A protein has these predicted regions:
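Short loop segments and helix-boundary regions at transmembrane helix junctions
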Residues: 5-16, 79-88, 111-113, 117-185, ...
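Transmembrane helix-bundle core of multi-pass membrane transporters
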Residues: 149, 153-225, 279, 334, ...
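Transmembrane alpha-helical segments in multi-pass inner-membrane proteins
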Residues: 259-340
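Helix-loop-helix "hairpin" substructures at the membrane interface of multi-pass membrane proteins
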Residues: 194-279, 303-304
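Short, non-helical or kinked segments that cap or interrupt transmembrane helices
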Residues: 37-42, 79-98, 139-148, 232, ...
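Cytosolic-side transmembrane-helix boundaries in multi-pass membrane proteins
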Residues: 1-24, 30, 238, 245-252, ...
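Hydrophobic core segments of alpha-helical transmembrane domains in multi-pass membrane transport
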Residues: 18-34, 71-75, 96, 100-102, ...
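Single transmembrane alpha-helix segments in multi-pass membrane proteins
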Residues: 31-36, 42, 46, 51-106, ...
């Protein structure tokens, strides 16, 4: 029997194996830091200090994590249906367009708590619409979802540049961005959370969209494990043959799963667009769609695991900036190498330790 098919307890499969992958990634990263003449322990200390050493640091860490929760959930929903959605980046771009259009239309007339739910719907619809075409091509024409979603990432980026340069730009301005949203189009910061712990949020853009991300994670958990649709998606993801025998319509599930995936990716735009910059800008996604792939894989496609993995990558982003500031020898590119190692071990090599764990577990498990 293949080791991939041997069942392991959840504490091994979802806890110990990802932890081992993470430890190895950090050990190799420490070796790289040592090679360039810096102390790995000092770098690790700066990483933790930058991410959690102040209220502002925690705020930035959770701000980054918010975006990664949305995109991680987006990837996970598709994976449960047997689809590998590489297009969360592009879907987030288009979701940002929907979010910004709502904010621009309503910010002068209603308060933020009226604008926000409409912006959520707008971002979700635009993101889902961008995911629909690859989903339709996969379901009806057999086009591979990986290829089409990658192509749509580039189309989305080009479309966003065109719209910001030629349509949505403020007249007389050079910067390719919309006007700044008024107060009715800005999400409030969660400074009160930091106040509870006796610290200050500072300049960190940690905002209400974090709560929306947690609610989205709860929704995905209900959807995947407590609904008929979720059961059909998981059945299709495990075996298309079994799904066919069970009478589960392939095309319908593929399209619905991708629509949900695209909507979640689109909702990511709430965080940077309405919660941080208060305007739509080029490159506001900042690679969060691609990081979401690693977040989903490291979190084993489970909402709780995705939240924890998103916080880890938020730590790497915020703590990495702190390291590059305090240790000039460790450049931003070196931080990307460290992040890449974590992605490598969390994603591409996620089953590296599984054969050994299976062997050890079979040796010591109770009869």
């Amino acid at each position: 029997m293949s080791t991939a098919s041997v069942p392991l307890p959840n504490w091994i499969n979802y806890g110990l194996i990802p932890l081992l992958n993470l430890i190895v990634a950090f050990l190799i990263s420490g070796f790289v830091v040592w090679l360039i003449g810096e102390s790995p322990l000092a770098a690790l200390s700066l990483l933790i200090e930058g991410a959690f050493g102040s209220g502002e640091g925690v705020g930035f860490t959770l701000y980054y994590a918010t975006s990664f929760i949305f995109t991680g959930l987006s990837v996970a929903v598709a994976i449960h249906a047997g689809l590998f959605n590489i297009g969360s980046e592009g879907q987030a771009y288009i979701g940002g367009l929907g979010c910004a259009l709502v904010a621009l239309a309503l910010d002068n007339y209603v308060p933020w708590y009226v604008t926000m739910p409409i912006a959520i719907v707008g971002a979700g619809i635009f993101g889902a619409a961008w995911a629909f075409i690859p989903a339709f091509l996969q379901a009806k024409r057999g086009s591979h979802i990986v290829i089409t979603t990658i192509m749509f990432n580039y189309i989305a980026a080009a479309l966003m540049v065109y719209l910001l340069v030629h349509v949505l730009i403020v007249p007389g301005k050079m910067a390719p961005e919309t006007r700044t949203f008024l107060e009715g189009g800005q999400l409030p910061k969660l400074g009160w959370v930091m106040n509870i712990f006796g610290t200050k949020l500072g300049a960190a853009p940690f905002n209400v969209s974090f709560i929306i991300a947690l609610l989205a994670a709860w929704f995905v958990w209900i959807l995947i494990w407590r609904t008929k649709l979720g059961f059909e998606m998981r059945t299709l993801g495990v075996s298309s043959t079994a799904a066919d025998y069970a009478g589960i319509p392939y095309a319908r599930i593929v399209i619905i799963a991708m629509l949900l995936s695209g909507a979640l990716a689109g909702m990511m735009a709430l965080n940077p667009v309405m919660g941080s910059s208060a305007r739509l800008q080029v490159e506001f996604v900042g690679g969060a769609g691609f990081v979401g792939i690693a977040v989903s894989l490291m979190g084993r496609n489970h909402p709780l695991g995705i939240i924890l993995a998103a916080i880890l990558f938020g730590t790497l982003y915020q703590g990495g900036d702190w390291i590059s500031f305090e240790m000039p020898n460790i450049t931003r590119e070196m931080i990307l190498v460290i992040q890449g190692l974590v992605i490598l071990f969390a994603g591409a090599l996620e089953y590296m330790f599984r054969p050994a764990m299976v062997h050890i577990y079979q040796q010591f498990k109770p009869a």
